[in-house]
From Swiss-Prot:
It comes from Nostoc sp. (strain PCC 7120 / SAG 25.82 / UTEX 2576). This is Shikimate dehydrogenase (NADP(+)). Pfam families: SDH_C, Shikimate_dh_N. It catalyses: shikimate + NADP(+) = 3-dehydroshikimate + NADPH + H(+). InterPro entries: Aminoacid_DH-like_N_sf, NAD(P)-bd_dom_sf, SDH_C, Shikimate_DH, Shikimate_DH-bd_N, Shikimate_DH_fam. Shikimate binds at S19, L20, S21, T66, N91, D106, Y231. The gene is aroE. Keywords: Amino-acid biosynthesis, Aromatic amino acid biosynthesis, NADP, Oxidoreductase. Homodimer. Belongs to the shikimate dehydrogenase family. It is an enzyme of class 1 (oxidoreductase). One of its GO terms (molecular function) is shikimate 3-dehydrogenase (NADP+) activity. One of its GO terms (cellular component) is cytosol. Its EC number is 1.1.1.25. The lineage of its organism: Bacteria, Bacillati, Cyanobacteriota, Cyanophyceae, Nostocales. The keyword Transmembrane helix does not apply.
C-alpha cells in the first residue's frame, strides 16, 4: 500500500508507456517487502530541466533514464560517474546529499552474463559489434572491461564510424578499438569469439529482419557467442541464424534485467536483489517462455 512514507523511484522518458522497468522493479521491491514504488514519468524533452527539479522537490530518491534523455540529462546533474562520462550517456540517477548523481549501468547489464553463465577467459578474444550508436558505446566499454584483445565496430556510415572512433581517442580503449564499414564483415565473422548486434534490425514489429543473413554467418566459428540486445522477439532472427551455425546465443532480456539489478543496488544500498523474480516478472509480462 502506498502511503505518505512510501519512497519514490521511477523512469523518465518520452514515451514511457511501454517501459518494462516498472514491471521488474516493482516485482523486486514487493519480494523484498520494502516501502518503495517505481513509477513511469512521461517527460517531453522541452520539460526535462523543470521535471528534474520537480522530481527533487517531491522527494524522488532515484530514477532510470531512457530515450530520448540519456545524453540531454548530463548537464542537469551535479555529478556523473567516470563510466557514464566514458559512454556519454546516463541511465541511472540517484539523489545524494541533495544533489542528482548520474551513472550508467548498461555496461554491468551487458557483461553480467559474460561474467557468469558464459564466463571464459576473454583476454585473447575478438569482439565484433554491429552498429555504432549509443548502445554500441556501452558494449565497447563492456568488452574492454572484460579484457578483449580486439574490439571491432562495424557500421554503414563512414563519417559516423570515424566520429565514433575519434570519441574514444583519449581513452585507453582506443588501443583495442577498430572501426570498419559493413563490407569488411566477411573478414571479421570467422575471427569473432563474440558477435553483438546493437542495431534495432530485427526488433518487433520487424521480426523477420536480421542485420546479417544466413550466408554472411556461414563462417561463424562453432561456440562463438552471438548476443543480441533486442529482447522482443525472443530469440531474434539474428540469434536463430547464428544458433544454426553452432553459436551460443544470449538475448537482450538478460541485459535489461541485469542493468536494472545494478540500478536497484545503488538506490536500495543493498546487494541482495532478487534477480530471478525480476526476470520471471518480465517473461510473464511479455508472454515469453
Amino acid at each position: 500500500m502506498i502511503t505518505g512514507k512510501t519512497k519514490l523511484l521511477g523512469v523518465i522518458g518520452h514515451p514511457v508507456e511501454h517501459s518494462l522497468s516498472p514491471v521488474m522493479h516493482n516485482a523486486a521491491i514487493a519480494q523484498l517487502g520494502l516501502d518503495y514504488v517505481y513509477l513511469p514519468f512521461p517527460i517531453a524533452p522541452d520539460n526535462l530541466e523543470a521535471a528534474i527539479a520537480l522530481l527533487a522537490t517531491i522527494g524522488v530518491v532515484g530514477f532510470s533514464v531512457t530515450i530520448p534523455h540519456k545524453q540531454a540529462i548530463i548537464p542537469l546533474l551535479s555529478e556523473i560517474s567516470p563510466v557514464a562520462q566514458a559512454i556519454g550517456a546516463v541511465n541511472t540517477v540517484t539523489r545524494q546529499n541533495n544533489q542528482w548523481v548520474g551513472t550508467n549501468t548498461d555496461i554491468e547489464g551487458f557483461i553480467a552474463p559474460l561474467q557468469t553463465t558464459y564466463k571464459r577467459d576473454w583476454s585473447q578474444q575478438i569482439a565484433v559489434i554491429l552498429g555504432n550508436g549509443g548502445a554500441a558505446r556501452a558494449v565497447v566499454a563492456g568488452c574492454y572491461q572484460l579484457g578483449f584483445a580486439e574490439i571491432h565496430v562495424v557500421g554503414r556510415n563512414v563519417q559516423r564510424l570515424e566520429e565514433f572512433r575519434h570519441s574514444w581517442e583519449n581513452s585507453p580503449i582506443a588501443e583495442n578499438l577498430q572501426v570498419h564499414t559493413w563490407d569488411y564483415l566477411a573478414k571479421l565473422i570467422p575471427q569473432a569469439n563474440l558477435l553483438v548486434n546493437t542495431t534495432p534490425i530485427g526488433m518487433y514489429p520487424q521480426v523477420d529482419e536480421s542485420p546479417l543473413s544466413a550466408e554472411e554467418l556461414v563462417n561463424l566459428q562453432t561456440g562463438t557467442i552471438a548476443y543480441d540486445l533486442i529482447y522482443i522477439p525472443k530469440p531474434t532472427q539474428f540469434l536463430q541464424k547464428a544458433q544454426q551455425q553452432g553459436a551460443i546465443i544470449i538475448d537482450g532480456l538478460e541485459m535489461l534485467v541485469q542493468q536494472g539489478v545494478a540500478a536497484l543496488k545503488i538506490w536500495l544500498q543493498q546487494d541482495d536483489i532478487p534477480v530471478d523474480v525480476m526476470r520471471q516478472a518480465l517473461i510473464k509480462h511479455l508472454g515469453l517462455k
